[in-house]
Amino acid sequence: MHSTLCQVFAAVSAMLVNTATLAAGPCTAVSGAAVPVVVELYTSEGCDSCPPADRWLSKTISERGKDAAFIPLAYHVDYWDHIGWKDPFAQPAFTQRQSALASTSGASGVYTPQIFVNGKEDRSWTGGAARLAAAGRASVKFSVASAWKSDGAALALIVSGKLVEPAPSLRLRYAVTENGLVSAVKAGENRGVTLRHDAVVRATGALTVDTNGAFSLNVALPRAMKLGNSQLHVIAEDARGAPLAAATLVCPV
């Protein structure tokens, strides 16, 4: 494992040479020993039922501290943008992911706020808790390295890593999230309310793994992101989308 991490670190460093100004050097992580608890909140600033769910997620993040097995992801959807307030963090791709999850998990439908835990709809959060216990030991291991990159006009994240034991049925996805976001809503159902968000997904997608188990990606990010409040999650899943392992990187700036 140590040699694999060294190889990944060297690969990322090589990718960064002569490309742009780095906000900081590469940082590395190894996937955790436990199967992760991936909590996906689908929310919108245009929905007046969503602030309690946003607060619940922030509270849960605070309570879980630095629990490496807890992966919180807040996806802002765009289907409420037409009722008076355009959510600045919403993306059509997040709406598409919610619809796909609802379909494959047998959920009752698509709505906000909606929470999925490891791909399954979970309404128990309304009682103050959700099913967030770890689901056993991880059967997959991988190492990952990343570094912020800026050329003064654009912001990006360079990601590289390697699965210890590649398998055709495995797939990897990433999510870059940001904490501490604040919006003063001026129209719509939440008009006049100041909303605070954590774990807001700013970029997400699939990671292509080669036959040797290696993967790499250069992710374009919103220029306004505050790197000190941001983190990268990489999640290994089986063919059905069930999480098997995860790693989180909070890189220095």
Stretch-by-stretch model annotation:
Residues 2, 22-111:
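Active-site-proximal cofactor/substrate-binding loop regions of enzyme domains
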Residues 18-20:
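N-terminal signal peptide c-region/cleavage motif recognized by signal peptidases
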